[in-house]
UniProtKB/Swiss-Prot annotation:
Domain (Radical SAM core): residue spans on this chain: 79-369
Recorded catalytic activity of this chain's protein: uridine(34) in tRNA + acetyl-CoA + S-adenosyl-L-methionine + H2O = 5-(carboxymethyl)uridine(34) in tRNA + 5'-deoxyadenosine + L-methionine + CoA + 2 H(+)
Protein name from the UniProt record: Elongator complex protein 3
Organism for this UniProt entry: Schizosaccharomyces pombe (strain 972 / ATCC 24843) (Fission yeast)
Binding site for acetyl-CoA: K161, E472, L473, H474, V475, F495, G496, T497, Y528
Keywords tagged on the record: 4Fe-4S, Acyltransferase, Cytoplasm, Iron, Iron-sulfur, Metal-binding, RNA-binding, S-adenosyl-L-methionine, Transferase, tRNA processing, tRNA-binding
């Protein structure tokens, strides 16, 4: 069969699949997409089923029930279930900055220019999905961002709201000129501008149709000082991911972290007083810790106000060739927990998580063939949640309760929505966690993090008068395009405005603040302008 004949048959098959999907939608019938694809492929004698991207491309732009069809065809709906499209990009490979002080990298770190995986960035192998996309793009930020946005769009996702995650080691240790160009290109990828000037790129990004709602930067406590925090505000950064790995000073020293746990706690306070959301990386099963100390360190982490971050990534220790830990393992001086013990530990950690914390990840994305010892399965979260069911405990972190995830995994919808408030002290400040929830079904629709800063805050926007700080405002549910509404979804239904009004009331009458400021993604500034906020340095502020 000629190439043109095959292309014609594939196009015909895609059109028939779309027609049957529209018919089933009209008749309110549930249809098995895989069975439909196989039947149509067999009819046209195709050797393989049409790809999802081809079927999506075959839907006419003015098709009746297009949005409903897209929901059925969307690949990996979890990607935008939280209301935004997350786009991970990597900076160029560079050496870890603390090699200059300690003489080497952390004992468990697999990547970097001096490792067995020499074309990879620090702490990555080069075989993770994000790493492979970065290598294909030769670490060009513009190519990485455009490629990933187009890929998500072709898979049926709404990509009007994008959050960047900058991975690949300590970004803030790279030269300033490289950092500025890198961030400018990320903003250009959404706005279509071609400027190399950082401030100009940010201005264009504010007006862009595809909004940059936030940037997350991976860093270390020694690259999270005043000057680094100020620089990241200029980029449009709203969240920091800080490598902690352990709350024990002896473990930080023995694993060659190059910083103390005391420095970590000081960084958390500084970052939160500047308005950032703080996410940490923690590693259970490190050398010389043991099960009892592991459980105790997570109790300490969630209960001690010196820690208590907004989010957490759990990375159980992996033994990978070329690392110091690999040598310890090979000579019998280190041994991982058994798979059953590890699942048990993760289940016990998840039971401790407070409702204002989000568990972003539970294991690394490193391919199993590269792992000499450690996690043996790719579904550790699922196994841990099943173990929790057996033990009669429940995970109440944000991700487990948010409305988008409940719809994707359990097809559960909220019924009676209420405003809930939780207050706690953390990192020298008073934190208020406001949320709209269905308490009966334990479903979270939207949240707001309000902070009365500690007296160590240094930003001039906050020191001249008492100021309260909104560090996060997020309404969950599948992503809805900007300027659009969907009565079946929760974004753009007014929950964000209501949460902000309550935050303003608390700031004025309970904190005694004269001003309320929001750390806002570059693309979200117009939203706050409509609510009476004005640009105040890198923040959006309103006098109370």
């Amino acid at each position: 069969m000629s190439t043109s004949s095959l292309a014609f048959l594939k196009a015909k098959a895609c059109a028939e699949i779309v027609a049957e999907l529209i018919a089933s939608e009209n008749q309110n019938k549930v249809i098995n997409l895989n069975a439909l694809k196989m039947r149509i492929s067999k009819k046209h004698q195709l050797s393989e089923s049409p790809r999802l991207t081809d079927i999506i491309a075959a839907i006419p732009p003015d098709a009746y029930l297009k949005e409903s069809l897209m929901r059925k065809l969307r690949a990996k709906p979890v990607r935008t279930a939280s209301g935004i499209a997350v786009v991970a990009v990597m900076c160029k490979p560079h050496r870890c900055p603390h090699i200059a002080m300690t003489g080497n990298v952390c004992v468990y770190c697999p990547g970097g220019p001096d490792s067995d995986f020499e074309y990879s960035t620090q702490s990555y192998t080069g075989y993770e999905p994000t790493s492979m996309r970065a290598i294909r793009a030769r670490y060009d930020p513009y190519e990485q961002a455009r490629g990933r946005v187009e890929q998500l769009r072709s898979l049926g996702h709404t990509v009007d709201k994008v959050e960047y995650i900058i991975m690949g080691g300590t970004f803030m240790s790279l030269p300033e000129s490289y950092r500025h160009t890198f961030i400018a290109n990320l903003h250009n990828a959404l706005s279509g501008a071609t400027t190399e000037d950082l401030d100009e790129a940010v201005k264009f990004s504010e007006q862009s149709e595809t909004k940059c709602v936030g940037i997350t930067i991976e860093t270390r406590p020694d690259y999270c000082l005043d000057q680094h925090l100020d620089e990241m505000l200029r980029y449009g950064c709203t969240r920091l991911e800080i490598g902690v790995q352990s709350v024990y000073e002896d473990v930080a020293r023995d694993t060659n972290r190059g910083h103390t746990v005391k420095a970590v706690c000081e960084t958390f306070q500084l970052a939160k007083d500047t308005g950032y959301k703080v996410v940490t990386h923690m590693m259970p099963d490190l050398p010389n810790v043991g099960m009892e100390r592991d459980i105790f360190q997570f109790q300490e982490y969630f209960e001690n106000p010196a820690f208590r971050t907004d989010g957490l990534k759990l990375y159980p220790t992996l033994v990978i060739r070329g690392t110091g830990l690999y040598e310890l393992w090979k000579t019998g001086r280190y041994k991982n927990y058994t798979p059953n013990a590890l699942v048990d530990l993760i289940a016990r950690i998840l039971a401790l998580v407070p409702p204002w914390t989000r568990i972003y990840r539970i294991q690394r994305d490193i391919p199993m063939p590269l792992v000499s010892s450690g996690v043996e399965t790719g579904n550790l979260r699922e196994l841990a949640l099943n173990r929790m069911r057996d033990l009669g405990t429940k995970c109440r972190d944000i991700r487990a309760r948010e409305v988008g995830m409940q719809e994707v995994h359990h097809k559960i919808h909220p019924e009676q929505v209420e405003l809930l408030r939780r207050d706690y002290t953390a990192n020298g400040g008073w934190e208020t966690f406001l949320s709209y929830e269905d308490p009966k079904q334990d479903i979270l629709i939207g949240l707001l993090r309000l902070r009365q800063c500690s007296d160590k805050t240094y930003r001039p926007e906050f020191t001249s008068q008492p100021t309260s700080l909104v560090r996060e405002l997020h309404v969950y549910g599948s992503a809805v395009p900007v300027h659009s509404r969907d009565p079946k979804k929760f974004q753009h239904q007014g929950f964000g405005t209501l949460l902000l009004e309550e935050a303003e009331r608390i700031a004025k009458y309970e904190h005694g603040s004269k001003k309320i400021s929001v750390i806002s993604g570059v693309g979200v500034r117009k939203y706050y302008q409509k609510l009476g906020y004005t640009l105040d340095g890198p923040y959006m502020s309103k006098w109370l």
